[in-house]
């Protein structure tokens, strides 16, 4: 019964983590930027980001913990080790975004009064674009790794 509960918690954490990322990345953010002005959309997304990243941290810690617990209970194998390592890398990606990237993005954004008034070659705009690109890349990598984790999980599940 303990194994069933661990599997349930593991599956729920992965579903909420990857599902939340997919929803925000492919549905919410594009719609927000389509409907609102760039300034307003940026403010909405900036308000969502702390919650978005905390969801990733909480779900990542739970997924990592339950994956380790399942490995201990069911004996480690190559796929379970790979899955657990990938989850750890995903969690590191989220933590990197929270601890390193987001403070830098916020610091640059605080210096920008309006994106509309900034020239395309303005150093602040270029720095914001560079940081945004790095943040996008980390987010995409975490999402893609999450899909790999989901595949490994589906491949190793016993019904």
Predicted regions and their residues:
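Polytopic transmembrane helical bundles with strong interfacial aromatic enrichment
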Residues: 1-159
């Amino acid at each position: 019964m303990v194994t069933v509960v661990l599997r349930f918690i593991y599956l729920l954490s992965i579903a909420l983590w990857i599902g939340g990322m997919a929803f925000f990345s492919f549905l919410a953010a594009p719609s927000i930027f389509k409907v609102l002005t760039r300034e307003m959309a940026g403010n909405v997304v900036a308000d969502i980001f702390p919650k978005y990243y905390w969801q990733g941290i909480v779900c990542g810690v739970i997924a990592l913990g339950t994956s380790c617990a399942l490995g201990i209970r069911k004996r480690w194998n190559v796929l379970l080790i790979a899955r657990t390592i990938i989850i750890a890398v995903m969690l590191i990606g989220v933590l990197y975004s929270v601890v390193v990237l987001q403070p830098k993005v916020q610091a640059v954004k605080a210096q920008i009064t309006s994106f509309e008034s900034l020239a395309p070659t303005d150093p602040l705009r270029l720095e914001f674009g560079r940081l945004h690109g790095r943040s996008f890349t980390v987010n995409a990598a975490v999402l893609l790794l999450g899909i790999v984790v989901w595949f490994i999980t589906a491949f190793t599940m016993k019904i």
